[in-house]
A protein has these predicted regions:
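Beta-propeller domains with acidic blade repeats across secreted/periplasmic ectodomains
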Residues: 26-411
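Beta-strand cores of secreted/periplasmic/IMS beta-sandwich domains, seen most often
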Residues: 57-58, 63-64, 72, 586-612, ...
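Extracellular/periplasmic metallocenter environments
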Residues: 103, 554-559, 642-691
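Acidic, Ser/Thr/Gly/Pro-rich low-complexity segments and short DxT(G/T)-type signature motifs
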Residues: 408-413, 433, 497-557
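N-terminal edge beta-strand
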Residues: 408-409, 566-595
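A short glycine/threonine-centered beta-strand motif
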Residues: 423-436, 484-486, 497, 600
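Short, surface-exposed alpha-helix to beta-strand junction/turn motifs within ectodomains of secreted
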Residues: 431-470, 495-502, 511-514, 612
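Extracytoplasmic beta-sandwich strand-turn segments characteristic of Greek-key/jelly-roll folds
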Residues: 458-475, 618-667
């Protein structure tokens, strides 16, 4: 591998301009200021190469190795475009099965295929792999969702790999571990020995080794209220009970059993042979994972929750920012990708009373496709491999490879948040304006958590505002200590700082963080602070006002046929979903002012809705839905805007909703859109209104 550059035949990028295309943002609506600090460059991909990144690693000579979901491995020389010359792509291996991880070791490449951990070598130095060795293989059932990820190397030289659960046939919503070690993390040695490590994963797409410790990223789904990052130790149970099917095996280190979970949380399993009933959210509060963990030793709760729809919808890779300052002031912190929303979040950790905890804040969004894998270049830049086939993404492209470069300018950001015995300490990258920092009305802290249940995802529960009673700004202006009442252990705390400014009067680049408070530290409580009292908060708008706040004769969501429609609707439509974030009908044609009955059915595996909006407003409505924040799910991700003409409820997988509305009186092309977070870019259709 050391002389790989000289030995591979090169594939010239014919017809592509020198260098890279600069991408200031995915679209004009994204915060332009992000690009002032971390610019994005799009690597050109030769025609005919489908570069759906499943694995990505930097080689010792600075080249990249990229493994694709289609089973190819490419070597990309000169990825940073030095001397204004093009990158070169060379196929190193092919014929593998859906690679979703890649590592370099001693001149070879090691990757997770669907059913095995494989090591490939170029023994004759001709630039192509000629030896494919099985390091360790595991059984598969053939279900499409049995993805395998990794490896990542532990300090002792062994590797971690993880595997998805499958789903049922008739009960297609229910995660299943059909064969051994699905839904587990496994430790594998280079000589092919496997040790089951931890159970309870659902879709563990990201593996991170941080200071020698193993962390993994999880996706929202059944039993998973939202995405998160968890510190994993041998014997941990991580939350999804399907993999506990194998916990009785003698080689299993996991002590939790399915009965421990099912006796405390009803799994609502359909009987063999049916009827098959998909579990839906119940009005009762239920239990949170941490509450079950108090009763069942061995359950590991997340170190950092990533609120669904806010910091992503499909958590992917984990990487650690190098401490050499080539990538700005955040050295040692994590970056966590999100495939569905085409973004990266930044995570800062601390350890309190033996437990990892910390916060997350948005870092960079606007990638061209779904963020799947990340690797660091020798110059300190970040390469981001992307894909969205079958999964969908906010980014519009099927695949992409981009480079994120620190421009040298320091953004005004939350550097980190630390838990205190009586509140939080927030550290910033620049000194704050003291007047704005001491204004209690410029802060807003809300604690909340998710349900632990067999339903896909969870609404926010137990959300309560936390009163700020005191503020103290450090002498250098870079730290603000908050005295906070109402903090709760194991809860997520949304910390919003919309009023904070730096010395130049600039607002934070990203003003909201989400801190998971697993333990309150001991220590000295705050003294010498400025006592404060917040102004009364405005009462939240009622959901009814949200649904009916317009001047139409019909409510924006009318679910029964209006009594004046004695002859019934003029036109009836059934609209469905297709994989990849699409409606099954791209256009509906209606007459101006006609009476419409529309039923939307959701056959997808994630929630969707239908909003009919005014011309040209689909993207702004989609962004407004994301900005609903913690209230988004409660409001069905339907913002209270005049541009929203009619809408369904938020429809869970397998569900349907019927609405009645009057078609616009003015002919033209209107848009219908799904505003569930991350969907609005691609999930759109046209309502063509004719005279």
């Amino acid at each position: 591998m050391k002389d790989i550059r000289r030995q591979f035949s090169r594939l010239f990028l014919i017809g592509l301009s020198l260098g890279f295309s600069q991408l200031p943002a995915q679209n004009k609506s994204l915060p332009a200021t992000e690009d002032n600090y971390y610019s994005m460059q799009r690597l050109p991909i030769p025609e005919g190469i489908v570069l759906e990144a499943g694995g990505l690693v930097t080689l010792p000579n600075g080249s990249l190795a990229l493994a694709t979901r289609r089973g190819d491995v490419w070597i990309i020389d000169n990825p940073d475009g030095r001397n204004n010359t093009r990158p070169y792509y060379r196929k190193f291996a092919s014929g593998l099965h859906e690679i979703l991880g890649l590592a370099y070791y001693d001149g070879d490449l090691i990757m997770a295929q669907r059913s095995e951990l494989t090591r490939i070598k170029d023994t004759n130095k001709d630039g192509r792999a000629d030896v494919y060795e099985t390091v360790y293989s595991w059984p598969v059932s053939g279900h499409y969702h049995e993805y395998s990820y990794g490896p990542r190397f532990l300090p002792d030289g062994s590797m971690i790999v993880t595997g998805n659960v499958a789903f049922g046939d008739n009960d297609w919503w229910a995660g299943q571990s059909r064969v051994p070690w699905r839904g587990w993390a496994m430790r594998v040695t280079l000589d092919g020995k496997m040790e089951p490590w931890a159970a309870g994963a659902r879709s563990p797409a990201g593996i991170g080794i941080v200071d020698g410790e193993f962390f993994y990223s999880e996706n929202q789904g059944d039993w998973m209220g939202s995405g998160y990052i968890t510190h994993v130790e041998k014997g941990d149970f991580l939350g999804h009970p399907a993999g506990l099917r194998w916990a009785d095996r003698p080689e299993s280190p996991v002590k939790v059993r399915q009965s421990d979970i099912y006796s405390r949380v009803d799994p609502r399993i359909s009987p063999e042979g049916g009827p098959y009933v998909k579990p839906e959210n119940l009005p009762e509060r239920g239990k949170a994972l941490f509450e079950v963990a108090k009763e069942v030793p061995g359950i590991k709760t997340p170190a950092v929750w990533l609120p669904h729809g806010i910091l992503g919808i499909s958590t992917s890779d984990i990487t650690t920012i190098p401490k050499d300052h080539l990538f700005g002031p955040f050295g040692g912190q994590m970056l966590v990708g999100d495939q569905g929303q085409s973004k990266i979040s930044r995570v800062f950790l601390e350890k309190v009373k033996g437990q990892y905890q910390g916060g997350a804040v948005l870092f960079r969004e606007g990638f061209r496709s779904g963020v799947m894998r990340m690797t660091w270049g020798h110059d300190g830049s970040l390469y981001v491999g992307q894909t969205n086939r079958g999964w969908g993404s906010t980014g519009p492209d099927d695949y992409a490879l981009q480079r994120v470069v620190y421009t040298g300018r320091t953004p005004f950001e939350i550097l980190k948040i630390s838990a205190q015995p009586d509140g939080f300490e927030i550290e910033f990258t620049q000194p704050v304006d003291k007047a704005s920092a001491e204004d209690v009305n410029g802060y807003d802290i809300t604690g909340f958590i998710y349900k632990y249940h067999p339903v896909y995802g969870s609404p926010v529960i137990d959300d309560q505002n936390c009163a700020i009673k005191g503020i103290k700004v450090s002498s250098d202006g870079k730290k603000v200590r908050l005295l906070v009442e109402g903090l709760r252990e194991k809860y997520i705390h949304e910390i919003k700082l919309p009023g904070l400014k730096n010395g130049e009067g600039n607002a934070l680049l990203h003003n909201t963080a989400y801190y998971t408070l697993n333990a309150v530290p001991d220590g000295a409580k705050l003294t010498g602070y400025k006592a404060v009292k917040a102004a009364p908060r405005n009462a939240p708008e009622a959901a009814a006002a949200h649904a009916h706040g317009h001047t139409s004769k019909l409510a924006k969501r009318t679910v029964t046929q209006p009594s004046e429609w004695s002859g019934g609707p003029d036109q009836t439509f059934v609209l469905g979903t297709e994989p990849g974030l699409h409606f099954d009908k791209k256009e509906l044609v209606v007459k101006a002012g006609s009476r419409i009955k529309l039923t939307m059915t959701n056959t997808d595996d994630m929630p969707h809705n239908f909003l009919l909006v005014t011309r040209g407003s689909a993207n702004s409505v989609g962004e407004a839905a994301i900005n609903l924040g913690l209230k988004g799910n409660e409001l069905g991700y339907v913002p209270d805007l005049p541009s929203v003409l009619s809408h369904t409820k938020l429809i869970e997988p397998g569900g349907a909703d019927t609405i009645y509305f009057i078609a616009p009186s003015e002919p033209g092309e209107y848009t219908y859109v799904c505003t569930y977070p991350g969907h609005y870019f691609s999930m759109q259709g046209t309502l063509k209104v004719v005279p």
